[in-house]
């Protein structure tokens, strides 16, 4: 703390992503890869199981977006479209992004990804009733959105020399010393929500 008072612009590693968000992110990556692999290898059982895992993770993330740590909350990172556009316009510059969590553009991307996941899962449930085409279409749309997400990560590395992947692994981001630390919620609450989400997804899997 004393160091922050010496130089308010000095960059210090600050916890920005809690364990729940990081675990959610990488489990989601894994289950999405398995879901697509199951579809391409014509393994419907694997595809279905991974799809319901995605549903559980999605339900958890939505809940954590309202009651979770500051940087996980929708209210913290959902800004106006104008703010997102200004953030995108600033992308080609060398000006470092000092957002504690998601900036405005990344916030919108997060919501778009969650919405695309929800649509893909929803059409997947409808697929069991014979509606195959919408699910396949959403799967391709989701791939496009994921590609855009990866392109943004590469753009930040190229233009701003910022690694967006490392903080999602370590939970820490280098920020000016005067930056207020975000509030982190008890991870036991996250575990309880994940278990509830898993139970709901399991129940849905027996309904469809």
Residue positions per predicted region:
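Membrane-embedded alpha-helical bundles that constitute the cytochrome b-like, heme-associated redox core
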Residues: 1-208
